[in-house]
């Protein structure tokens, strides 16, 4: 286990019905999701997670080399299981290991503005210089927009 991977896991707590902002990254930041088809594989996996009631997605953006995902964790699964399932499904479909180990998570506190967090997430393509308007980027969703 790499030194930073252990620090990613320290203090991690999974709580049902908690809203989380998760970020997971491709191995060596390879822009594998620049491919429309590959990006849609991630989106399909996120939707499946919702359909199985593991999560309730509030917002996401699939960037060329990472994913931001804001969701409410269901009561049947642990946070690490949900992330592992998403990563595994996409890896199997692509046919090769693509993910950096671990992920970053932030449990949203009651006093945090969830809509502003969603705006931050979906504005990622603008900040990265990929598009001028959010609507021009195809791989995002937010329940408020």
Identify the meaning behind each predicted range.
Residues 1-145:
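Short catalytic/metal-binding and nucleic-acid-binding patches
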């Amino acid at each position: 286990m790499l030194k930073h991977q252990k620090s990613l896991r320290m203090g991690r707590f999974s709580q049902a019905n908690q809203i989380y902002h998760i970020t997971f990254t491709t191995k060596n930041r390879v822009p594998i999701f620049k491919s429309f088809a590959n990006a849609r594989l991630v989106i399909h996996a996120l939707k499946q997670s919702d359909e199985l009631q593991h999560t309730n997605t509030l917002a996401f953006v699939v960037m060329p080399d990472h994913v931001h995902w804001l969701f409410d964790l269901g009561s049947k699964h642990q946070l690490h299981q949900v992330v592992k399932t998403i990563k595994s499904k996409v890896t199997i479909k692509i046919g090769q290991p693509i993910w950096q180990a671990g992920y970053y998570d932030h449990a949203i506190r009651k006093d945090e503005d969830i809509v502003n967090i969603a705006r931050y997430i979906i504005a990622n393509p603008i900040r990265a210089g990929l598009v001028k308007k959010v609507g021009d980027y195809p791989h995002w969703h937010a329940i408020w927009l």
